[in-house]
Amino acid sequence: MKCSVVKLLLTVIIPCSSLAQLQYPNTKKTDTIDNYHGTKVPDPYRWLEDDNSEETKAWVIAQNKATQQYLASIPYRQQVKRRLEELWNYPRYTSPFKEGDYYYYYKNDGLQNQSILYRQKGLKGVPEVFLDPNKLSEDGTASLAGLKFSLNGKYVAYSVSQSGSDWRVGYIIDVNTNTRLSDKLDWLKFTGFSWKGDEGFYYTRYPEPQTGEHLKGKNVLPQVYYHKVETPQSEDILVFEDKEHPQRFAGVGLTEDERFLLLSTSEGTSGGEIWYRDLKDSARTEFKLLIPGFKTEPRVVDNVGDKLLVVTNDGAANYKLVLVDPASPAAAHWKVIIPEKKEVLQSVSTGGGYLFAGYLKDASTKVYQYTYEGKLVREIKVPGIGTAEGFGGKKKDKEFFYMFTSFIYPPTIFRYDIETGKSELFRKSEAKFDPSLYETKQVFFKSKDGTKVPVFLNYRKGLKLDGNNPVLLYGYGGFNIPMTPGFSVSNAFFMEQGGIYAVVNLRGGSEYGEVWHKAGMLEKKQNVFDDFTGAAEYLIEEKYTSPAKMAIRGGSNGGLLVGAAMAQRPELFKVAIPQVGVMDMLRYHKFTIGYAWSVEFGSSEKKEQFDYLYKYSPLHNLKEGVQYPATIITTADHDDRVVPAHSFKFAARLQEVYKGENPVIIRIESKAGHGAGKPVTKQIEEAADIWSFTMYNLKMPFKDQSGNTQGKEKLKGF
């Protein structure tokens, strides 16, 4: 690919048609042109990729000012925010887990920015604060990103993220005294901690980025190190790096008995190899290959003596569990423990001397308990259609705690007796939401090519099929990630206001195994967009809603989905909410970890892949003279997963080709990232802005708890 840049700068004033009062900031254009395999592609907003430039910073300030002026004019914005604060304000807990003499759990009193880690001796003991992330920053933007206790519970290693960045800093706490040691580990990313006894642990880090590049520079050459407690990071021992393949990922883990050190490598977000070291053989320090090829998705569950339990889709698109002998690891020698089923094997964990296998049946959880020999003990019954997680623990455990949730069932914690199979309610949710007033319905429709695709519909009982119901259509469709039922305070608010929250299980996810995933990746990515627009058409045909009442939403890969859908079928939707989306499909691989997505998307550096990427890339398929939906684009200044340049350039182009009365605004959050670790204050503010924008443009009045409505008047000040 060749690139030519002409430094002539042009200034464009964006017309606002009949909504002349909403003045968009001027956005400079340059004569930047790329040549992709003979096709010349203009990139006039390339300068917005430089998030450190004063021009870009000024543009961000101007755009946020215009956005906030518009949002402040929505008559009921403050009422929406107050109601969201009321709904958010209830105690939330995670399932407890035991380490040493203590049970640990996270709790948020309601409006605390970050959940606090508590501990107590016994389930009826007195709780004490163990680690409070709210004390790590004044504004709640520092978050606890992960933690792991040492073998005997003497220490805990934890990592902290600042402003939602994927970069982490690691620390260690002495559990007995609850004091932080002097250890500090920098430049951690995409890693956990794998303890060896109480002496030290393995982790992955990256080389320190160049100045000014830590939020957008390409991350390559991951390095696996061993850190000994109470020593400086500079003395850590390098365990693995691959200079010949610097774009491969690398991570390590240990089996529960600490016999095997496992190294997982991958060339992207799909496909992997597994290497191992038998630590019982101290004379051997090199890794040996266990599962080769990068063509399958292997995951080691644990070991059984000198053999390893591995979940694999090798010859089993819906996955199976096999026992692998490292001495003869070829697939022909594997022993099948849990064979492939019609449903997708989503996870296998261990606990109390048993295996727990989690399956997806039409995107809902089924859980089974097995012996290590593969004999079925029982199905673990869960309350209904929804998502259950948290099964498993240590081999010595007699019980564990799991959580069940659905779209209309707030997270509820159950206590499970491993031997008897008895589940009992441990902690009921205190959410200000009455599930008896709502219902969930799963429907199926035929996509453009005849494929049957499921949709979850969630709404208040008494729904009338008159084509006038407001709908929020949500999807993701990629990276082998399923969209499973889960409760959200934000979505509960929309249902409370009379909306239908609809979730489509698009191809590209893992709802129906690897075949479903592959049907929505690379050159078949268009299937994902067809599934999404097909769901919209189905809801319109069945009189659930109409285009004037339809909003679409998605984040990250789902932001790409929304961008592509609104570009291809703008007439279907009234509101579009692309969040932290991948919008420039020709240059995404040039930033941070984006190159890893090429196994899913393809790369513009290859002619045949450029051709289909260019056809659907949201940035490159916005056309002059089209009335696009009312659009609120969201991103954040510390998003180093999908850099904000994607959203910046998409917003600039959409405002450039703007026609009609629908607003196009971009909300750029400060001191926030791709979404993880976002403080509750920022979550509520963002939800208030998005729902106010959505409801107003769908002509939904705000309903208070007394049944009074507000919002039929025009925008204040416009």
Predicted regions and their residues:
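Polar, glycine-rich mid-to-C-terminal structural blocks
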Residues: 222, 226-265
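Short, conserved, GDST-rich strand-edge loop motifs in beta-rich repeat architectures
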Residues: 161-162, 205-220
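Beta-propeller blade signature
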Residues: 119-120, 171-175, 218-230, 275-280, ...
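Cap/lid segment of the alpha/beta-hydrolase catalytic domain
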Residues: 134-150, 159-165, 179-182, 416-422, ...
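Hydrophobic beta-strand positions that form the internal "hydrophobic ladder"
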Residues: 103, 153-157, 201-202, 261, ...
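Non-catalytic accessory segments flanking enzyme active sites
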Residues: 54-148, 159, 248-303, 336, ...
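Bacterial Sec-dependent N-terminal signal peptides
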Residues: 1-23, 709, 713-718
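Active-site-proximal cap/loop segments of hydrolase catalytic domains
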Residues: 503-718
